[in-house]
A protein has these predicted regions:
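Bacterial N-terminal signal peptides
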Residues: 8-17
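Aromatic-lined carbohydrate-binding surfaces of glycoside hydrolases
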Residues: 67, 81-84, 108, 112-116, ...
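Beta-sheet-dominated interaction scaffolds and their linkers
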Residues: 24-69
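Short, hydrophobic/aromatic beta-strand segments
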Residues: 72-80, 185
């Protein structure tokens, strides 16, 4: 009897192994980090175990590529387990989000593109609709009776099922949120892929949780534009109830990626004709909830409606504000700042005063507007999107009017930035289109032929992660981007901003969820890497508090010494990040002892 039982178990193990080999021949799962992209026909070089490392209150991502080496497969389900850690502690599967990577076409290359035209994974189609909490159903058409009109249900874009043809790949993206209260240690689980024909394959997952915690909101200041353009993508009227619902979902998506969302105007105090503010209780309550829930750390005060200067500087009144309007505007700024101070929001307050003043007359306008704000509220900061040196030495110096300078990456000059910082100003940085250093750059001859990390689909994903590293090098404390939802040719098939040249993904980080049946955004791989860069900055600041800037910069030097020299190798970023984490852990132990 014992021998028969042993033989039965032995045969079962052999058959199980045989089935696994057969499945393994039909499905191969390969792990990639969040900075890699795999083409549909590209040969894969990756691991067969997922290994990631994370602080608490951080989201860390990985990719699993599903490949079909021998025959076409039809994947019908992907599931992930809880991750089990020390003494039975868990990172629950509810804290893990899965997405299927959709491919978009780059038809015409961006200027100075680093990668060729073709298909690139970028939109992340969620397995679960974040609004309904249910899977996105594939589109189907049914007809109850011949001759009757068909009934359509489901959507064109969904996560599963999906086909993988022989020799091709399909990547799955996973976001793992590590809660604040989990014990440190290694958490193990698995991701399993099921295909038709009764075949499946799994890949082990190991998440190492480090003993430090990231703050809720972004330390690195930022401004990423407004969401007015989503009305176009969803074919709705601005300020309609549906628009407000969708706008709020975009705001939530920004917050989830450590970007301060634009505060909807309908939540702000109402401006009266005399410049005074009316605090509407319902708005105020909702605004408090918005700031708390979305971890908002900056507050842009809208420009006073009474102090708008003409965009055309050919008009004789291009820099004139009447005494009456000046008085109203100053009352507006005083009352708005008091409102923020009364609620503890004044620390991150600023006025986005002027964008790219490219004429002498624009400099004069900046001076007039800044003086008006500072006379009303000396401590209220004025932001101007401009480099930290004059375009022309004959132009007026706007330094007294500006508190936050925001140069293009290629316009940055370290020496002049240090001068502004020494005077008590802040410096942010921003990118747009493809612009090299201007002729009036102090080191033009040295940097004129160099390129900073432009933001487009046809470039390595690392260009979205590295700016916060370089910003830290220069003591730059903020990041600005002109839009995340600009008008593109066609968002899902040709996401290019034409100006008139193609800027693939320029000003466009969120895909409209319409083809997925989502009344909100579909996230891009690019914004995930931007989030990782914002999280990296939190590491920098934690280490700086435990040691000093020099210690942090020594590690960053290996990745990004300046705006024209920076790594594009994912493993170099991960190695530097781990060095920072190990330094934090070492110094934290010393600090606690």
């Amino acid at each position: 009897m014992k021998n028969r039982t042993f033989i039965t178990i032995f045969l079962f193990l052999i058959l199980s192994s045989f089935e696994h080999v057969l499945a393994g021949e039909k499905i191969i799962l390969t792990a990639l980090n969040s900075m890699e992209r795999i083409g549909q026909d590209q040969k894969i070089d990756g691991a067969h175990t997922v290994k990631i490392w994370s602080a608490r209150n951080e989201v860390e991502s990985f990719q699993v590529v599903v490949s079909a080496p021998q025959e076409n497969i039809n994947v019908i389900k992907v599931e992930i387990s809880d991750l089990i850690g020390p003494e039975g502690s868990k990172i629950e599967k509810d804290d893990i989000k899965l997405f299927r990577e959709e491919y978009v076409r780059v038809r015409i290359s961006s200027p100075r593109a680093e990668l060729p035209p073709g298909l690139y994974p970028d939109p992340l189609v969620p397995f679960i609709n974040p609004i309904t909490g249910k899977p996105i159903e594939p589109i189907t058409r049914t007809q109850k009776r011949w001759g009757e009109p068909p009934t359509t249900s489901g959507y064109d874009m969904y996560a599963v099922p999906f086909e993988v043809f022989k020799g091709q790949n399909q990547a799955i993206w996973a976001d793992v949120y590590v809660p604040k209260n989990v014990p440190v240690g290694i958490y193990n689980g698995k991701l399993r892929v099921f295909a038709k024909g009764g075949i499946s394959e799994q890949i082990p997952i190991a998440v190492t949780v480090w003993d430090f915690t990231l703050p809720n909101g972004p330390t690195h200041r930022n401004h990423f534009g407004s969401f007015g353009n989503i009305a176009r993508y969803f074919s709705i009227e601005r300020n309609s109830d549906r628009f407000k619902q969708i706008e709020m979902r975009y705001c939530e998506a920004m917050s989830e990626h450590r970007i301060n969302p634009p505060i909807p105007r309908y939540l702000l105090p109402q401006s009266n004709d005399d410049g005074s503010l009316e605090i509407i209780p319902e708005r105020h309550t909702t605004l408090k909830e918005f700031i708390s829930k979305l971890h908002v750390t900056d507050f842009e005060i809208p420009r006073a409606p009474f102090a708008r200067l003409p965009s055309s500087t050919l008009r004789p009144d291009y820099k004139t504000i009447s005494p009456t309007n000046r008085k109203k505007a100053q009352r507006y700024y005083k009352e708005f700042y008091k409102y923020l101070k009364d609620n503890g929001w004044e620390e991150g307050a600023y006025v986005y005063m002027l964008d790219e003043p490219n004429l002498r007359e624009n400099y004069e306008q900046a001076f007039v507007l800044g003086r008006l704000v500072h006379e009303a509220v000396p401590q209220l900061k004025c932001l101007v999107v401009e480099q930290t040196y004059l375009q022309d030495p004959s132009w007026p110096d706007i330094d007294p009017a500006v508190d936050i300078w925001c140069p293009l990456w290629s316009f940055i000059a370290r020496e002049t930035i240090n001068e502004k910082l020494a005077h008590g100003d802040e410096v942010w940085s921003y990118t747009a289109l493809v612009q090299r250093a201007p002729r009036y750059h102090p080191q033009y001859q040295t940097v004129k032929d160099f390129d900073p990390p432009y933001w487009h689909i046809d470039r390595p994903l690392t260009v979205y992660r590295v700016p916060t590293w370089i910003n830290y090098q220069y003591n730059i404390t903020g990041l600005l981007y002109w839009s995340t939802v600009t008008t593109v040719i066609e968002p899902w098939s040709n996401p290019a901003f034409a100006h008139p040249r193609h800027y693939n993904g320029g000003g466009f980080l969120f895909y409209p969820g319409v083809p997925c049946g989502i009344d909100g955004p579909v996230i891009s791989m690019r914004i995930k890497n931007l989030r990782d860069g914002m999280e990296d900055y939190e590491y920098f600041m934690i280490l700086e508090r435990l040691s000093d800037k020099k210690t942090v910069k020594k590690i960053i030097d290996a990745i990004a010494p300046d705006w024209w020299n920076f790594s594009k190798t994912p493993n170099e970023f991960l190695a530097a990040r781990e060095r920072i984490a190990q330094q934090i852990l070492k110094l934290k132990k010393v600090d606690e002892s």
